[in-house]
Amino acid sequence: MAEYLIPKSAVVFEEEIKKSRFITYLQHTEGLEQAKAFWAEIKALHPNARHHCWAAVAGRPTDSQQLGFSDDGEPAGTAGKPMLSALQGSQVGEISAVVVRYYGGILLGTGGLVRAYGNGVQQALKLLETERKVERQLFQVHCDYAQLNWIQILCEQHQIEIYQQDFQVQ
């Protein structure tokens, strides 16, 4: 059984850097489709913002097929990538970050953007409450009634949860 941390509740962190307003949202998302839906939800919430950058570790923290990010118009590699790096460093799975930027008229440069987006996610992660997720698999076992006690003992020894029992005659 694999287990890892996931967000328990959503987080919002806001800061101003050189007159630009950065609002970071973190939320539990299971899969990239939910991550993209979360991004669309935040984008609709802030239609006048200049950028809506996102990053997601949408599965287990070690599952590279469930990663995604977007710079949403910022110079390539200055927003989504540092956001994703911060998420991966947290070892939290099933998490998405969206950072909304209201441009304040002062250019931050590529280094400034990398720091602003990455740090926003890091600060939000410090506020994040997590809970442990245990991945489980469902199995169906058919046996004679005479074998039932042996199977129950085996399940107990290996911490296997019996979800349902059906005693039908076959």
List PLM regions with ranges.
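Flexible, glycine/charged-enriched surface loops at secondary-structure junctions
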Residues: H51-C53, L128-Q137, Y163-Q165
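Active-site beta-strand/loop microenvironment that shapes enzyme catalytic pockets
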Residues: A79-L127
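Short amphipathic alpha-helix segments
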Residues: H142-I162
